[in-house]
Amino acid sequence: ILKKDNYSYISFYNALIHEGYKDLAALLHSGIPVISSSNGGKDSVGGITS
């Protein structure tokens, strides 16, 4: 799953957060891919700004 694409990685991370696996999600947080968006240059994932 982690080799598919950036959105798969982010989706997996968000699922860990949602299901209460914050300790495991914390291990993945540093590897979250940066995805450009039109939100003023700030990238966020699941409400977390990197």
Curated annotation (Swiss-Prot):
The CARD domain mediates interaction with APIP. The monomeric form is autoinhibited in a closed conformation through a bound ADP at the nucleotide binding site. Exchange of ADP for ATP and binding of cytochrome c trigger a large conformational change where the first WD repeat region swings out, allowing the NB-ARC domain to rotate and expose the contact areas for oligomerization. The lineage of its organism: Eukaryota, Metazoa, Chordata, Craniata, Vertebrata. Residues 46-50 form the NB-ARC domain. Keywords: Apoptosis, ATP-binding, Calcium, Nucleotide-binding. Monomer. Oligomerizes to a heptameric ring, known as the apoptosome, upon binding of cytochrome c and dATP. Oligomeric Apaf-1 and pro-caspase-9 bind to each other via their respective NH2-terminal CARD domains and consecutively mature caspase-9 is released from the complex. Interacts with APIP. Interacts (via CARD and NACHT domains) with NAIP/BIRC1 (via NACHT domain). Interacts with CIAO2A. GO terms for molecular function: ATP binding. Residues 1-31 form the CARD domain. The gene is APAF1. This is Apoptotic protease-activating factor 1. Signal peptide: none annotated. Oligomeric Apaf-1 mediates the cytochrome c-dependent autocatalytic activation of pro-caspase 9 (Apaf-3), leading to the activation of caspase-3 and apoptosis. This activation requires ATP. GO terms for biological process: apoptotic process. Physiological concentrations of calcium ions negatively affect the assembly of apoptosome by inhibiting nucleotide exchange in the monomeric form. Coiled coil: none annotated. It comes from the Eukaryota.
